[in-house]
Each structure stands twice: as C-alpha cells, then as structure tokens.
C-alpha cells in the first residue's frame, strides 16, 4: 500500500533526509516541498542530494513520491500581472525540480480569483497552465480539490473540470483528491464516499486522480474552512478515512497524510505520522493516539 506523509526537505541532506524521515514513520511513499511553501527561495537541483535520496528510497522500498508546489503561486490572479507572471515562471522551475527528483506529480492549489469572480479566475488559470505546460517533460500538475475558503477556485468538481477542459496539453493534468477539503466544500465524504467518487467520475473521471491527501477535518461538512485534523479525531472520522485509504480505486496511488503535529506547546509539537500509519494499516482506531504521540 502506498501510504505516507508530508516530510521535510532541508539542510544538507535534502532528499536523503526526506527519505530517512519517511522510513522512520514506516511509510512506503512521501510528499515534499522543494523549499519553504511560503516563499520562492530554492536550492539548485545539484544541491537537492537526489542520488543519495534515491539510494535510501531503494533501500527502504519508498516509491511514487509527490512534490507540492508552494502556496504563494496564484495563477488565478487577474488583478496583479506580477503575481500571475511569478506563478507561471516559478511553477515551470518547480516542474524542472520535480522531474529531477523523479516525481511524476506536482500538487497545485488552482488559485484564488481575489474578487474578480470564478469565471475570470478559471480563465486565468487556463491561460497560466497553457503557458506552463509548453515545457518538454512528463511531469503532471495535480490540481487539488479545494475547501472553498475565501475566493479559492476548485471547490467543486465542475470548476476543476472546466480548467482541465480548457487546457491544451491536459493529458499532463491530474487531480489530487483531498479528503478534508472535499468534505469542507460540502461533499459527503463521511457517509457516502462511493457516491462522491461516482460524481467525480462522471464530471472528471476517476482515472485523473493520481494523489490522495488523507486528512480529517476540524469542521462540519460544508464549512469551507480547510482546517486539518488528525485521523479519526475530526468530523470525517476514522471509519470513512480508513475506507478511503483501502479503496480499490486508490490501490496504486500515493496516499499522503497532512495531519497536524500534536501538542499544546508550539515549541514541542510532535509528528503523528508513524502512529497514524500504523493505525490505518491495522484498520483499527486508537483513541489514545495523541497521548501516545506525545510520549514518543
């Protein structure tokens, strides 16, 4: 089963350190940002320690890794040309890094229309993706299902379908299905996941899903908040998330946890991924998980 989490990529070890961290959590795949998600400061490809990273991955059976584009990219912005241009240029650079790392998909938040309206935002995203996808490689951009916070685009399957339909090289577009976001956008992930998946299949096609973000939610369905919760401790619940993780449709797809670190003290929060992954492998909810994480 391809199950992992977001891990860090920093210091001198970079990808090697990411692979070691993923192995320590008992993962078979993982997701990284190529640098801080809040800025565009990046190391050169030569400094990402890719060869050693791949050696560690091979040693520990890690594969199908995923890259996440930084949050600052907003190619839906119609009001600031500099924001749009930065997004296009930086996304092209990120795709080059993604290919060098050996990942097939880079996850992208489609963007926010910042008041110009959904139609204008979607048209701008299509313009940006058509420009980005002229580069010659086989990396896919995985458009993420969004919660609908603020002016986010991608809160409905129809919005994502409109983007995909408008892009010329759309064989290089995939979808990252985020359980928390989709729940927060109003879909009944908790009680009728197969119904949600059937709807997705009719509108976009399930074969477009190449990454799944497995997150519980701190909010009720339809809240449009996007606040992740640990597996089984939120409004989606363990049973639904366990069902999704073991779903036949996602057997060969990386499933990535982005659940929050545990702990009241901001300086002493601990990653939950090792125990959350064990829990999902055993298919049995542990209500003591957060306490056990703090005792690690």
From Swiss-Prot:
Q: Where does Zn(2+) 3 bind?
A: 181, 226, 228
Gene Ontology biological process terms in this record: base-excision repair
Span of the signal peptide: none
Q: Which PROSITE patterns match?
A: AP_NUCLEASE_F2_1, AP_NUCLEASE_F2_2, AP_NUCLEASE_F2_3, AP_NUCLEASE_F2_4
What catalytic activity is recorded? Endonucleolytic cleavage to 5'-phosphooligonucleotide end-products
Entries under NCBIfam families matching the protein: nfo (TIGR00587), PRK01060.1-1 (NF002196)
Name the record gives this protein: Probable endonuclease 4
Specify the species: Staphylococcus aureus (strain MRSA252)
């Amino acid at each position: 089963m391809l199950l992992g989490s977001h891990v860090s990529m920093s210091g001198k070890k970079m990808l090697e350190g990411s692979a070691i961290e993923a192995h320590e959590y008992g993962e078979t795949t993982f997701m990284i940002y190529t640098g801080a998600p809040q800025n565009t400061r990046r190391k050169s490809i030569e400094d990402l320690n890719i060869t050693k990273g791949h050696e560690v991955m091979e040693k520990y059976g890690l594969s199908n890794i995923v890259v996440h584009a930084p949050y600052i990219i907003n190619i839906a912005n119609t009001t600031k040309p500099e924001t749009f241009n930065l997004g296009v240029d930086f996304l092209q650079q990120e795709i080059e890094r993604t290919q060098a790392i050996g990942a097939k998909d880079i996850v992208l938040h489609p963007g926010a229309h910042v008041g110009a309206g959904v139609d204008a935002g979607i048209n701008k995203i299509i313009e940006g993706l058509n420009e980005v996808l002229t580069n010659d490689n086989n990396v896919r951009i995985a458009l993420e299902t969004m919660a609908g916070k603020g002016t986010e685009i991608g809160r409905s399957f129809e919005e994502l379908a409109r983007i995909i339909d408008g892009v010329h090289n759309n064989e290089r577009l995939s979808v990252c299905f985020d359980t928390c976001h989709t729940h927060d956008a109003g879909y009944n992930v908790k009680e009728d996941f197969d119904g949600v998946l059937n709807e997705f299949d009719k509108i976009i096609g399930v074969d477009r899903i190449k990454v799944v973000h497995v997150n519980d939610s701190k909010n009720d369905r339809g809240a449009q908040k996007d606040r992740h919760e640990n597996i089984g401790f939120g409004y989606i619940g363990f049973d639904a998330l366990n069902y999704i993780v073991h779903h036949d449709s996602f057997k060969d797809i990386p499933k990535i946890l982005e659940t929050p670190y545990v702990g009241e003290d901001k300086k002493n929060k601990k990653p939950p991924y090792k125990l959350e992954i064990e829990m999902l492998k055993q298919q049995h909810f542990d209500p003591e998980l957060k306490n056990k994480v703090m005792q690690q």
